[in-house]
Design a protein with these regions (language model features):
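Generic protein-terminus/edge-of-domain signal
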Residues: 1-66, 74, 107-109, 118-122
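Short, Lys/Arg-enriched, Trp-marked, Pro/Gly-tolerant hinge/linker segments that flank
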Residues: 120-128, 145-158, 165-184
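Amphipathic, well-ordered alpha-helical segments in soluble domains
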Residues: 42-45, 133-137, 159, 163-166
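Residues immediately flanking
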Residues: 48, 72, 94-96
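Short beta-strand His + acidic residue motifs that chelate non-heme Fe in jelly-roll/DSBH
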Residues: 52-54, 70, 76-84
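Σ70-family region 2.3-2.4 aromatic/basic alpha-helix that recognizes the −10 promoter
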Residues: 86-88, 157-161
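A hydrophobic/aromatic-rich effector-binding and dimerization subdomain
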Residues: 2-21, 79-143, 169-174
């Protein structure tokens, strides 16, 4: 993956942007991360590393392609078991205000966030092909954010909305396979 798309790990646990922030991390010697929470949603797209995720008092093993969504105010942290392999992941923060804005456009944008808060099921495994599609959307968004291209400010929200709708559809169709098949 391109080095210029990576971000050095930041211990800051608050958003600087009003709507969202997206990071690609590739850490080799990450120090311990304390249990913390945010006032925004945190999507976590795991790629590599000997890591588990603690959410509340539960500890979950994670694997390549796992997606995690932590709602606002839920304590969580990664637990690094070994630094023998790099700890690679994308982290996508999105504000509650932006989610509410999308909800006004369509309730379909909020399905996943509502599902996670009600079910307390924070993890969604994916297969390699699905995760590659998600990774492509994440990289495209990072590249656009870091670019100075014509139309950048118009393109960025389209990419964010596309990513969110894709994730919502993915989870909805997994949880409602009969309905998805009848709609085809």
């Amino acid at each position: 993956m391109k080095k210029n798309l990576q971000t050095a790990f930041i211990t800051r646990q608050h958003m600087l942007s009003r709507d969202f922030e997206l990071y690609y991390y590739n850490d080799h010697n990450l120090s311990k991360v304390d249990l913390h929470s945010h006032n925004y949603y945190e999507f976590y797209f795991f790629m590599e590393g000997d890591v588990s995720i603690q959410i509340g008092t539960e500890v979950y093993p994670i694997h390549f392609g796992d997606i995690m969504l932590v709602p606002p105010h839920i304590p969580h942290r990664p637990i690094i078991h070994s630094t023998a392999s790099p700890y690679r992941r994308f982290v996508f923060w999105i504000s509650q205000e932006y989610c509410n804005h999308l909800l006004q456009i369509s309730k379909d944008y909020a399905y996943l966030m509502q599902h996670v808060q009600v079910s307390q099921n924070y993890f969604f495994p994916t297969d390699r092909i699905t995760f590659n599609a998600i990774q492509s959307k994440l990289l495209r968004l990072i590249e656009e954010v870091r670019s100075d291209r014509f139309g950048r400010d118009a393109q960025i929200p389209l990419y964010v909305n596309d990513l969110l709708l894709y994730l919502n559809r993915l989870v909805y169709e997994r949880l409602h396979p009969q309905k998805s098949r009848t709609e085809e």
